[in-house]
Amino acid sequence: MRDEQIKKLRRELLLKQFELDTVLGVAHDMTARDHTVDELYHMLRLTLQGQRNVVQLLLFAREDHGFKVRVALGCDLAEAEKLALTPHLLAGGVTNPQAVEDLHLGEAWDRYELVIPVLRQKQVVAYVFVGGLRDNDVRQQLIPFLGSLANTLIGAVENRRLQAQRVADAAVRKEIEIAQEVQAMLFPRSLPNDAHLAIERSYVPHTEIGGDYYDVVEIDADRLLLCVADVSGKGVPASLLMSNFQAGLRTLLRQGVELATIVPELNHLLFRNSGGEKFITAFLGIYDRRTRRLQYVNAGHNDPLLLLDDGAVHALKHGTVMLGIMEELPLLRVGETEIPAHSLLLLYTDGLTEVFDAHNNEFGEEGVLAVLQRNRYLPLPKLHQELLRSINAFSAHDAQFADDVTILSCRFK
């Protein structure tokens, strides 16, 4: 009798050693090189196929949208995918090994006898369903063994996903850095402040890479271009489209062409590069210091506001539709206006007006105009601060604006 007990203990010890070696071997193989997630699950399947006590097995792993069958032994994977976990299981409600019949899963689950949950940081990350168990000794032996194997696998899968996420995050960070560099190069480094006019700008991006653009270009000794634009989308694609827009604009300005030619050419350039999938709203104005006249085109953009010294307000509306959505512009009207002394011109993007309070009331052009009329004689930097302070106070989202905010103001002396 004693000899039989010793033999049994030796068999159990050898089995435990074999199981430990198996788990360690699997752990080594899974970390030896960068396996894909599918390869990791396949390695576990091959390991389990060599275990004579494992006849029926399913491994459900938690993924983004619930649990998914990743390993199936003793049945077809497509058949296993038809099995549905109960809400209790989906919520991670089974945290200890349990008889499947106690879960009342239905006849489709009759071949499975035991469910072994796999926990990481006290959260259920997988379930192992086992069937074909010969006796209670086999059941008790398999619980820690399969739990250890599954835990090793899930750990390797999580590490692989974290590694992939780190690579993806690094790529996104690099993309953001490139887009930020491109965007920084687009904006003018200095703005005119001379005997004829003074210009100020403010730019508050909603995300790390905004979709707004502004520019001031000295064409010759008398004329300069004022431009504010809003590009659809964000990120590198938007910054590249913005770069194309600026390059085309500056090339046309160097050639000495008029707005009536510049705008259709820019539209054609944008349509050719984006295929009509992206667009730009823009305001382009050319001011002549000598004649005090402003020629402009409003391409589907927010109307700039011109405040005269006598209190009159003019919205600069003439122009065309947004650029880049069609190959040929259906209409184009170049506006022209004289700028009296002591006038104030405000160009901006829709991030300044499309701000909503707790009752869903919009700040709008009326709100912008009200701030301008109260503060029009403030120094331009302080005027910008007051505009930003006003929309911040109005917004239901405190300092979080729903879009980029760009302000370009010009005071004519």
List where the protein language model places each region:
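Amphipathic alpha-helical "output/dimerization" segments
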Residues: 137-158, 244, 340-341
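A short, aliphatic-rich beta-strand micro-motif
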Residues: 101-104, 110-120
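… and, occasionally, acidic/histidine-rich disordered N-termini of signaling adaptors
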Residues: 163, 167-346, 398-413
